[in-house]
Structure formats: C-alpha cells, structure tokens
A protein has these predicted regions:
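Catalytic histidine-centered segment of alpha/beta-hydrolase-like enzymes
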Residues: 356-369
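A short, exposed helix-loop element centered on a Lys and neighboring polar residues
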Residues: 115
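ATP/NTP phosphate-donor binding region
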Residues: 83
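Flexible "cap/lid" subdomain of the alpha/beta-hydrolase fold that forms the substrate-access gate
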Residues: 2-80, 88, 93-101, 112, ...
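Glycine-rich NAD(P)-binding loop of the Rossmann-fold in SDR/ketoreductase-type enzymes
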Residues: 109
C-alpha cells in the first residue's frame, strides 16, 4: 500500500521529467536542422566562389608533416587500456621520476597543440601529451557508442592509472605499514580535453593532485548559460550541426578543409597572437589525421554523444584548480567565466589572458607555461 502511494505521489514528477527530456530533445533537433541549413548555405557559397572542382576536392595527406611523428618535441609511445585493449598514442618529455603532467587536447587538434609546453615544462615535469581515442595516432574504434562520455572518462582514468606513479605504502601508527596511498598527477585540459578533465577530477579526486582548465566549460554550467544567452547559442551552432549524420563530415572537408583551416588560422576565430599564427605545416599536423578516410567521424562522435543522459557532476572538484581563459575566445562567451568561477571552490584561481583567443596553448605558450609552472610549483595541495 505504501509503495503504491509513493508511486502515485511521484507520478507527476516523473511526467514532468519525461516532458522536459522530450522538449530538450526537440530543441536540439530543431537547432541541429537550423544549423544544418545555415552551414549548408555557407557550403553553397563556397561552391559558387570556388567552383565544383576545387570545392569537392580535398587532399589526403600521405606523409605526416615535420614535428608530428618524429622526435622533435618528445618521445612517441603507446599504451593499451586494460579493459578495452584500445591502443592510445602519446608523446612524452621530461625526467621519468618527475611529477606527471598529463595534457588533454580538444577538437579538431591532437597532441601537437601541446608542443610548446612539452619543450617549456619538459625539464621539470614528466609531460605527457595524449592523443584521445579517435584522434591522431590513437586507435579509432567504429561506431558512435565507442565515444560516449562515460567511455572517454574511463579512458582518462585508466591512462592516469597506467602512467601515474605507483601507489606507495604509508606508515601507520606504531610503525605499522598502512594502506597503499595513490600518488597523484597534474591534469591539464583544453577544449574537449578540459571538459573531460573537469569530470575526471570531480569523480576521481584521489587521482589528481591539481587541475588546470583552459577555455573549457563545465557541463553543469554550459547548458543553463546557453539557454539564457543567445550569443553563446550562436557561438555553439557548430555543436548542433555536428548532431547530424554525414553532413558535417562533408562540410568540414569542402575546399580541402577550409572550415577547419578558418577556425584555426583566421584573425577572428584563430590564434590572436600574430607571432604564433600557425604555418601551413602546423595546420597539416591536424589535417593529416582528419584527412584520412573516415578521419573526421570519430572526433565528431564526441559531439554526437554530448546530449545523452550522462550524469553531470554537480560538486566542483575539491582539489586546487586553475582556470585559464582567452579574453578574445570566439567560441565561448566571456560571461561564462564568472559563472564557472562561482561553481568552483573559493581557493580556485582564475586568469583571463588579454588578447588571447580560444587556442590558448598555441596562442600564448610562454605566459601559459609560466602560469602553469607557478601554480603547479606552489604548495597549496588539498588535504
């Protein structure tokens, strides 16, 4: 009788939640169609401007450009995840006994975006720049389900477990050996890597010593902010485009990946620091993997799983956190920063870099390296 009464009382709440999910899904579907039309018109403009031959021709890069696959920036290695057996590629530099600094890239990049930090911090830390699954030289399992958010988070957890320092046995009262204590790592994420880093640090704070986030929103903040700010909805229009099948792959490939090039190199979307603008070879370091047959689909599947019902951690990471943000970020509204600051612990640090865009590790490599070195080198570890 009591169970029936409880079920009856909860029925309106269940109905409201079901309606809310339906409305949210309809909203995403409408936004995806609208974005598809808008970007489709851009594709038509490219066709009229360049003609069919140049528009529908894209070059598969046969050889990696200098720096991508050689040892210029560090040693190339692979690891196998314990559960899935998936092989992930990473580049490492620094003393093997130094603290582990794990770097997670975003879209549409790969480990190469961390090349400056590998050089600048590789003398004091064991720096590891990972290729996330589906990117670069890491394996690219087929199917959208292989890129669910919970799968990606588990990848990072296992990478920390494999590459991090081994547990040490502590000494308890009276000199007795205590339980193993996990030695932690420094976790740094940009863009998609930052989104993953937020949630790994929240769900596994015992594995992370300090957290650094660069131009990456927390899911708990982003949804509400986007609903209240039309400007962010427009800046994020590509996210809705990526919900569609095949069309994003086609549009991103047009005119030898013109849209990707524009995002990385244009004066208003790309790197703001003129001294750090990407060369043709540096752009090819990203296009090399994306241009391979099927190379665009795995990164886009990250976005296609973004609106699934994956639980969002509501509590901010308990560990020391540094939030770095480019003041001229073209993809993320600057008003997001105070919203993110409010969801962090009072001890968290925030640094807004004037004149910097979204691609912070390449836009301002020297200031970013100094800020990281100072933050990681201070002694404010959590207890």
């Amino acid at each position: 009788m009591l169970l029936s009464l409880c079920s009856l009382l909860l029925a309106p709440t269940r109905l409201l939640l079901a309606l809310w999910r339906l409305v949210a899904r309809l909203g995403v579907a409408v936004a995806a169609v609208a974005a598809g039309v808008a970007y489709g018109l851009w594709g038509l403009w490219v066709l009229l401007r360049r003609g069919p031959r140049r528009t529908f021709r894209w070059r598969v890069r046969d050889q990696p450009p200098p720096g991508l696959a050689d040892g210029t920036f560090g040693e190339h290695r692979y690891l196998h995840l314990k559960d899935s057996g998936l092989r992930l590629h990473y580049v490492t530099r620094g003393p093997p006994t130094a603290p582990l600094l794990l770097l997670l890239h975003g879209f549409p990049q790969n480990w190469f975006c961390w090349r400056h930090l590998l050089q600048d911090l590789g003398t004091r830390y064991r720096v590891v720049a990972l290729d996330l699954r589906g990117y670069g030289a890491s394996e690219k399992p087929p199917g959208r389900d292989s890129y669910r958010l919970e799968v990606l988070l588990e990848d990072i957890r296992q990478v920390i477990e494999i590459l991090g320092p081994p547990p040490v046995v502590g000494e308890g009262p009276g000199g007795h050996r205590g339980p193993p204590r996990l030695l932690q790592v420094y976790l740094v994420g940009h863009d998609w890597g930052g989104l993953l880093a937020w949630e790994v640090a929240s769900s596994h704070p015992e594995m992370v010593e300090k957290l650094v986030i660069m131009d990456a929103p927390h899911r708990a903040v982003m949804a509400g902010f986007m609903a209240c700010h039309l400007s962010q909805l427009l800046r994020s229009s590509y996210i809705f485009l990526f919900q569609l099948p095949w069309l994003p792959e086609l549009l991103l490939s047009l005119a030898d990946f013109e849209l990707v090039r524009t995002a990385l190199t244009s004066s208003w979307l790309g790197i703001q620091n003129a001294a750090q603008r990407l060369t043709e070879q540096e752009v090819d370091a990203y296009l090399y993997g994306l241009s391979q047959p099927g190379g665009l689909t795995p990164p886009l599947n990250y976005y296609r799983n973004l609106f699934r019902d994956t639980p969002i951690p509501r509590e901010p990471p308990p560990l020391p956190t540094l939030l770095l943000w480019g003041a001229e970020d073209a993809f993320l509204d600057a008003r997001l920063v105070p919203c993110l600051r409010r969801c962090l612990r009072p001890t968290a640090r925030l640094c807004l870099l004037p004149g910097a865009g979204h691609w912070l590790p390449e836009d301002q490599p020297r200031p970013v390296a100094r800020l990281l070195d100072h933050f990681l080198g201070t002694g404010d570890h959590h207890h």
